[in-house]
């Protein structure tokens, strides 16, 4: 009591304490970073290696495997996957959450160094690594277009000037330049001209390489001067290479231009990028795992004017895609929802107390509690994101509850004629323990969340801590500022004023009287209520088992990603046409604002598209509805598929795929994997629970298989090395020399001119110069025939792997899909040599599913322990927790009604309900125990009186929590997909709980009291202390 009096009788100190809390909160708010969600990115590092011209199988065995063995020894690697395609290998390392990305990078570099001696000697450069997740959508895409400069020149500006500068910006993890390649001098050989002149391809390669040499020449000096020696040993342009003498035939010089077309072109002609309908170079910017997306985007935008000045005016630099506007809009929506919630809960107080002065008190205490929370959020390193702001929105109902309980009890004493200061002290003393019990037991709900590991634990931790801090500050404010303001602002009510009840007041009295009558009937029919209570428990179990489940609600971020997968034998020219056709279909859709895409590189039959939708207020459909509409139009394109998926703020794993969810097949027997993967994929494609089923296994590419006749080769004086060198020179876009420029290094690329490689007959024109100087056609010692070959070879760990990706059709959940996949695998009878498991987000969903029930039980157990300690009783906590089954039924029924699957957000709602609905029982039990102790009432009289006496604060706190959550249900706009499941769960649970617990709690209280008396050694003792 002295504690309360200290603040009630020292108003200046109490006000200044509240002002200090508020100022600290305002300061913290101004310094808090902004993000879509809490920081939950896994540390991911990509290791890349190249060997131009090498087949996928060669890359996998000679490059990927040695690197994997070395990288696999690094501590903290949770997953290692690799993909090897024509001339390139990429290994993706995903680390544990607690692994420092910089320390991991040092270990990766050491592992690369250790494996270097095992790698092929012909690699043009050492393997490199980048700290970025390739499966993440870019946070920003910049495009370069020009009517003056070529694509190669644009690429040069992008990779040489723009990308390095952008990479230095804080938060940027990777800048991927696509749409073309660096400028190069291309030597397109004419096989017939070479044969006529008796010049081999190796002769051309050697001549070009020897003609362009950059070596130190030294210096001359005498007694007084020194001269640096400089020669014209370098050739820079196609015009300089064209007259190069490469051979003498019968005394005549054979120049490079006589046997080849030499052009200033690009390093790899099989690349194309577009923005809308225009050729473009794309700069796809991804953030570091620990970086804040808003701060990073703002830093890039601030740098753009400076970047524009570094490139010619004829080049147009534009932002094609920016992830930040929808994130900002989503956060603005949450902030508006928070303000509306505060206004609604204050309205509840006014309606019940019908006093402007009394309403001012929660109107002050609620903002103080919420604003003060920002200071703690800053100290904890949190951000302003959808979950933390949703926590504050929900907290409005909690923090006002504490103020309501104190305020209502003080108001009750004032209505009885007590003086304000005395009423404030007496009223606070009576409910101080109640408020403490409600707050501590509510915080206890979140203890299991704080101890939860993995991605779900990291995701929910910020929500739980934010809400717990708000409750803690609210507890302090409710026991200090609220009673002080009541004592100095409120006035004692006169008896005649108490009789003037109109409007809402009269309705409340009528409700209370009706409740009293119905409660008498219920207390005389306790068995029926017991049956209802047991029924709700059974219904909870059935609803939880049957409700569709997913990991995280599908978000509409306004951005779509598309993966193009064409026939495995498609040419680059045809693939570029497919990209243009798909982009036209997408661009013509009225909901699309911008579309960019690219194709080429090591995987000719694939491409990527990035689609920006119009803002939510300019379109009526959701992202998923737009995807469903486009899917029908895109299906009409023959020879290729475009798989669309909505970009999400959370994407688990480092695998790049054409759909949102992955199912991975592993085997140590590559033949078994190649046999069963098509069977499994075709079976999954028939399931109605899955859409857009596709696979990264591409083992049906067209190949021309050459078989050497080694005996003939030996007789003709030709070795395998010379034959393979011929093929690499002719068809491998072989980099034969380097051109050094001040800003970059460029390549001289040699191949047979594409005009002579339009069909298989090109092989017949190839020849090798033997050791006698004779031209021997390839057909003399080799035979060839068409065959199938893999376009890529994939590993997970050191096992062969294939990942099947899928999306969810409208109306289907991830639990439906995972159950259907499990059934399909069982029906197919897949052998034990082929192992299947979910990956990425689907894997985390499986892990979360297994822990959800344990988490709920742990929360209930924690609350029971806290209540047992507070009440020094084993029984009363059970009475209080008996309110939970009805809340669970209401929450699950509401989700079913709104066709919302049970997600991680809904789980938060269930956890919150555990804390919310028990408040009603705490208020009833507290006053019933007090009445038994000091009023000499029977248990039935005590609980009946407690129910009637606490009816008004119970209704106030429930409606406050309900109105606090209602804006989440009704909110639209950006980010509503995250807010609505939480609001639906809470509102549904509160409505059902309020209808039932007003009756079930008294019955359970009496049941346990009778049970206690039956087993008590002292039957005359009324209350368990």
Curated annotation (Swiss-Prot):
Positions of transmembrane segments: 7-29, 336-353, 360-379, 389-411, 431-453, 468-490, 853-875, 895-917, 948-970, 985-1007
Subcellular location: Cell inner membrane
Any one GO biological process: xenobiotic transport
GO molecular function: bile acid transmembrane transporter activity; xenobiotic transmembrane transporter activity
Recorded superkingdom: Bacteria
GO-annotated cellular components: efflux pump complex; periplasmic side of plasma membrane; plasma membrane
Keyword RNA-binding tagged: no
Induction field: The mdtABC operon is transcriptionally activated by BaeR.
Cystine residue pairs: none
Cytoplasm found in the keyword field: no
Signal peptide residue numbers: none
SUPFAM superfamilies reported for this sequence: Multidrug efflux transporter AcrB pore domain, PN1, PN2, PC1 and PC2 subdomains (SSF82693), Multidrug efflux transporter AcrB TolC docking domain, DN and DC subdomains (SSF82714), Multidrug efflux transporter AcrB transmembrane domain (SSF82866)
Pfam families: ACR_tran
Residue ranges annotated as Cytoplasmic topological domain: 1-6, 354-359, 412-430, 491-852, 918-947, 1008-1025
Topology versus the membrane: Multi-pass membrane protein
Function: The MdtABC tripartite complex confers resistance against novobiocin and deoxycholate. MdtABC requires TolC for its function.
HAMAP family, A to Z: MdtC
Oligomeric form and interacting partners: Part of a tripartite efflux system composed of MdtA, MdtB and MdtC. MdtC forms a heteromultimer with MdtB.
NCBIfam families from the UniProt entry: PRK10614.1, RND_permease_2
Family indicated by similarity: Belongs to the resistance-nodulation-cell division (RND) (TC 2.A.6) family. MdtC subfamily.
Listed name of the protein: Multidrug resistance protein MdtC
